[in-house]
Amino acid sequence: MSLLLVIFLLELVVQLVNTIGAKTINNLLWRFYLSIPGSPLAKDFAEQRAKQKEYLQVRHDLNATSSQDEFAKWARLQRKHDKLMDELEKKKSQLDAHRTSFSRKLTIYRWILTRGMQWFLCFWFSSQPMFWLPYGWFPYWVEWLVSFPNAPMGSVSIVVWQSACSGVLALVIEAVMAVVRYTGGTGMQKQRQPVPAAGGAPGTSKKDL
């Protein structure tokens, strides 16, 4: 794979991450991780869901039981309710701790694979031309500018190519998002268009009394 394409794909990933949002990506990956049957936390998450369901049922039964008419049953349900609440709070604290660690690791990996890779490629290939400009088509200052900082004169450097890809992709993604927002807003307006109330026959009007 050519370096030109690698830089373009890397910038595309960076722009998509910026558009979607790092927090949203972390949440989606966390849910996906919990849904994997063999993952270490899948069992804990399933237990938490089961306890939540049991807790809601006990709370429903507790609310439906009178503490005066059925005190023994009410006291038993209250003890079970408190026990399940404590267990859920402990389980939630454990999962929250795992989630924080998971998000921290994702942030580190994402930085290495995006920003870190950007800096590394710019440093490692700073003197390598991405492609050459047609000879004699551009003035000296343009050739010097596009070859900044260390590429041969008359060529396009990796820094300039990276900046160009980033700028073009940002504009394209912004245009696509604007079209999506406009299309969605138009559809909502059509759905909310008021329906005229049933009145008299067409061509008739009410007369003032």
From Swiss-Prot:
Cytoplasmic compartment ranges equal 24-110, 173-209
- What quaternary structure, including any partners, is listed in this protein's UniProt entry? Interacts with GET3.
Q: Does the keyword S-adenosyl-L-methionine apply?
A: no
Per its record, how is this protein called by name? Protein GET1
User: Per UniProt, which keywords does this protein have?
Assistant: Coiled coil, Endoplasmic reticulum, Membrane, Transmembrane, Transmembrane helix, Transport
Q: Name one GO biological process term.
A: tail-anchored membrane protein insertion into ER membrane
In residue numbers, the region (Disordered) covers 188-209
Q: How does it sit in the membrane?
A: Multi-pass membrane protein
Which residues are listed as membrane-spanning?
Answer: 4-23, 111-131, 156-172
Q: One MF term from GO for this chain?
A: protein-membrane adaptor activity
Q: Name one GO cellular component term.
A: endoplasmic reticulum membrane
PANTHER family given in the database record: GUIDED ENTRY OF TAIL-ANCHORED PROTEINS FACTOR 1, TAIL-ANCHORED PROTEIN INSERTION RECEPTOR WRB
The entry assigns this protein to a family as follows: Belongs to the WRB/GET1 family.
